[in-house]
Regions:
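Acyltransferase
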Residues: 97-105, 134, 356-385, 405-415, ...
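Glycine-rich, small-residue loops and helix-cap segments
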Residues: 96, 147, 187, 191, ...
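A short helix-breaking turn/cap at a secondary-structure junction
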Residues: 66-72, 269-362, 516-535, 553
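N-terminal secretory signal peptides
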Residues: 1-20
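Short glycine/serine-rich loop/turn segments
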Residues: 146-290, 315-319
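Short helix-loop capping/hinge segments that flank enzyme active sites or metal/cofactor-binding pockets
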Residues: 77, 146-165, 341-350, 391-445, ...
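Sec-exported extracytoplasmic/periplasmic mature domains
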Residues: 91-95, 108-119, 134, 138, ...
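Short, well-ordered alpha-helical
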Residues: 24-171, 201-204, 319, 524-562
Length: 562
């Protein structure tokens, strides 16, 4: 819908009833109590597959093929295809300046040179990627993802390719179909380069199932102690280290926003249900969110538009407002040469967000100053909702644990060794009572009600210091870079948005990235050490002779679990 006076498309948050999202969240909690989460091949993953071996039909989405999706590469990046954003690579492919196989090969060359250091992937599908690139070169053009190499977190089903979730439980599972999100990306022309490392069962930073640290932060590849973020660690390192154009992860408690902030990326956790969870190894029915990790707001918008939409295989995705024009939202708006906000926007600033003398606080203050200088952007102080610390604290946050333990109970009863280093949090979930879970669901609805009434009555988006509150209630978040520490480690921040209105925070980040260059910066390459190990799964890699990067204990994983 457009504004009758200006002809400008309205943001989705101006058209929606926020209370309807509250009612839907309550219904989702009730559905979760019935027990609707199913593990792949629950009777025995080594030999059993899901009873339904066909993925839902997915068709090409022409809405992605918009003029705003294409940008000619920057002069400084013209000579290196792996420096291009999706929109830049798409411009080059669309104008016949490069063919998909050349782009894929450029990334495979970097994987050959640097993957042994980064350890971003569980498996690299080099031959399949080159074959797909050649096929796309001879097919009708599909839009900005046509021929784009992508990294897929290893909890997304990939037909005929092991999907381990970095767990002993799934080490022999080979899905018979793709996850809906993977299918949607491939239908749009995306090319799967490989499956990426992750925290075991999507818990913490990427490690082997036994806790041995694998993936490093691309900005400090020789220092494995630098936090790379988790659990979508491998996807973040692959995109930041220029081993893939973009990638996808999942978030239950910061698993997209944390690695995005840690590695100078722009990542989106969309509204609950905006992207289908069908074909993803689950954690919780009410808090799992698939989403993209990308290099800038435009790329994140392209990826999310491809992934989003209703799916018959996931009731959470049905009956939602239509996906807004995210690509336009992520395109900076200019009046002549003057940048303006796409829509008049109030950015809510919570108490203490930029206080103190830390490098992070200084970067936050600089971010707020940049935004306040953009016409039609207003900074608004907003209070914490009533009982914020209680409602967002560990007591209620931990009620997610029994929900995720429930579908794993057959494994918990039979052999705890299959859970490896992540076993503690699964046992915690199994031991928490139903009363606590029900109380937690009531607390979640109260928290959501207060966020909608006491924060979003005064602002359109809100800055955050932690992803947890909006993870609990299922509201959208976007993480993006705002600076660097003195040691050269990225500093990021998070914006939270209103239900289904991913367009508004995307427009804010696009405006900010139009006046800053943090998102353009890339880490220096590590020393090239030759071809990566041939081990194709987490289980195989655990026996490979690689230098130790330390090991997380079960207690540490329980403390850090996402």
């Amino acid at each position: 819908m457009t504004d009758a006076s200006t002809g400008v498309q309205l943001p989705l948050d101006r058209l929606l009833d926020r209370r309807a999202f509250l009612a839907r969240t309550a219904a989702l909690a009730a559905t979760a109590a019935v027990g609707t989460v199913a593990l792949p091949g629950l009777a025995g993953l080594a030999s059993a597959a899901p009873s339904d071996t066909s993925a839902p039909a997915v068709t090409f989405n022409p809405d992605l093929d918009r003029g705003a999706a294409y940008n000619k590469p920057r002069e400084s990046a013209m000579s290196d295809p792996t420096e291009w954003t999706i929109s830049e690579a798409a411009w080059m492919i669309r104008h016949n300046k490069i063919v998909p196989v050349e782009l894929v090969q450029a990334y495979l060359d970097r994987i050959t040179a640097y993957e042994s250091t980064y350890q971003a992937f569980n498996v690299v599908l080099a031959e399949a990627a080159v074959k797909a690139a050649r096929q796309w070169a001879n097919r009708p053009y599909r839009g900005p993802l046509h021929g784009i190499p992508l990294a897929i977190k290893d909890n997304y089903f990939t037909e005929g390719v092991p999907t381990t979730a970095n767990s002993y439980l799934f080490q022999d599972f080979v899905p018979p179909y793709d996850a809906t999100s993977v299918t949607k990306l491939v239908v749009q022309g995306g090319i799967v380069l490989g499956k990426t490392q992750m925290g075991p069962l999507a818990t913490t930073r990427a490690t082997l199932p036994n806790g041995q640290v694998t993936t490093v932060n691309a900005w400090t590849p020789t220092n494995p102690s630098t936090n790379p973020g988790g659990s979508s660690t491998g996807t973040a390192t692959a995109v930041a280290g220029r081993l893939a154009s973009s990638g996808i992860g999942t978030q239950t408690g910061g698993s997209i926003t944390s690695p995005s902030n840690a590695q100078n990326l722009t990542g989106i956790k969309p509204t609950m249900g905006r992207v289908s969870l069908a074909g993803i190894v689950p954690l919780t029915y009410t808090r799992d969110h698939p989403g993209p990790l990308a290099r800038d707001a435009k790329d994140a918008a392209i990826m999310l538009m491809a992934m989003a939409g209703p799916d018959p295989a996931d009731p959470r995705s049905q009956g939602l407002p239509p996906v807004p024009n995210l690509i336009n939202a992520a395109t900076p708006r200019y009046d002549g040469d003057n940048l303006r906000m796409r829509w008049k926007t109030r950015i809510g600033v919570l108490p203490g967000y930029a206080d103190g003398g830390s490098e992070t606080a200084a970067a936050r203050r600089a971010f707020l100053a940049e935004m306040s200088a953009i016409p039609e952007c207003e900074l608004v102080e907003v209070p914490f909702p009533d009982e914020w610390s209680l409602l967002t604290g560990s007591a209620f946050n931990n009620v997610r644990l029994p929900e995720r333990s429930e579908p794993f109970m057959p494994y918990l009863r039979s052999d705890l060794r299959g859970f490896g280093v992540s076993v503690t949090s699964w046992l915690q979930g199994a031991l928490l009572g139903a009363n606590g879970w029900v109380t937690g669901q009531r607390a979640k609805l109260l928290l959501l009600d207060r966020i909608l009434d006491q924060i979003f009555s005064s602002c359109d988006v809100v800055v955050q210091t932690s992803p947890v509150p909006f993870d609990i209630v299922g509201l959208p978040e976007i993480a993006f870079p705002i600076g660097f520490s003195g040691g050269g480690v990225p500093i990021g921040t998070i914006l939270g948005g209103q239900p289904y209105a991913e367009d508004r925070p995307l427009s804010v980040v696009a405006a900010y990235q139009a006046v800053t260059d943090w998102h353009w910066r890339r880490p220096a390459d590590p020393p090239a050490v030759g071809p990566s190990p041939t081990a194709s799964t987490a289980a195989a890699r655990s026996t490979a002779a690689t230098p130790s990067r330390g090991r997380l204990t079960a207690e540490e994983v329980a403390e850090l679990t996402q």
